[in-house]
Amino acid sequence: LVGSEMCIRDRYWVAISMSKTIIIIGAGLAGLSAALQAAENGCNVKLVSSLPSERAQSVMAEGGINAALNTKDENDSPEEHFTDTIKAACGLADPNAVWGMTQAAPELVHWLLKLGVKFNMSGYDDVDLRNFGGQKKKRTAFAQSDTGKQIMTAMIDAVRRKEAFGMVERFSHHSFLTLRLCGNICCGCVIRDEYSQETVELPGDAVIVATGGMHGLFGNTTGSLSNTGEVTAELFRLGVPLANGEMIQYHPTTVKCGGKRMLISEAARGEGGRLFAMKDGKQWYFMEEKYPELGNLMPRDITAREIWK
């Protein structure tokens, strides 16, 4: 969706011109992160969202964020984080993307600390870590039981500071309609004001889509029903390549509340929670029996399949 000489290289923005206009659709964690990085590198940012950032799905994330910080003296490393991630993805993940993510993760956690995220700490200045699925060592940084909310609060404040200096322009309560195409080049997008129903055309050098999950595709979801997937559908209709649909995540542990599923955080199993089913009148701890090495902390796809069985 790039119509200019803008790219991301080695985790940093590289822009030929510092006057590029970047349109970002979505104002959750991904959208706000992109807005911050673009603004800090001299770009003009137009941030579009149908809801305020305070209602983004990212606010609901509870468990934590993974990074091989090795504050528990377990000889953890980004390389081991990479190996665990590729294994959990059954070899399907793009190794270049996974390598970049795992190498950057420790630096990104420290960046979030500088933004003001109040991660739990062990000792004076070490980030506390907990267990999560698919990993043999503790590498999940967390902020009490509302990690997503804490990160989003810090991100929202940081973006508002950019707004105050005119570096970011917000278009809250605006929905994405379609891209503006100049031949086969993306040169902006069309949005609609949800209050006035007025259509607005936004010209830009690049469009970043960060609209979250496609919860409207599924009968049962723990995600917000406002994340319908309609933006992804419109891009697909326009011929934008859609990849990695098989990576849509199925969270194994939920509670049914009326017509909605509420998530039980993986942190519950990371802190010792055990999964069982009744068999012959007794509690059968099936994950521990079938997967003795990691037990209840097997990757989510495996755990979800075992529960379904």
Predicted regions and their residues:
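Glycine-rich FAD pyrophosphate-binding loop
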Residues: 40-62
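Conserved redox-cofactor binding core of oxidoreductases
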Residues: 113-198, 210, 254-256
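Core beta-strand elements of the Rossmann-like FAD/NAD(P) dinucleotide-binding domain
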Residues: 19-20, 197-206
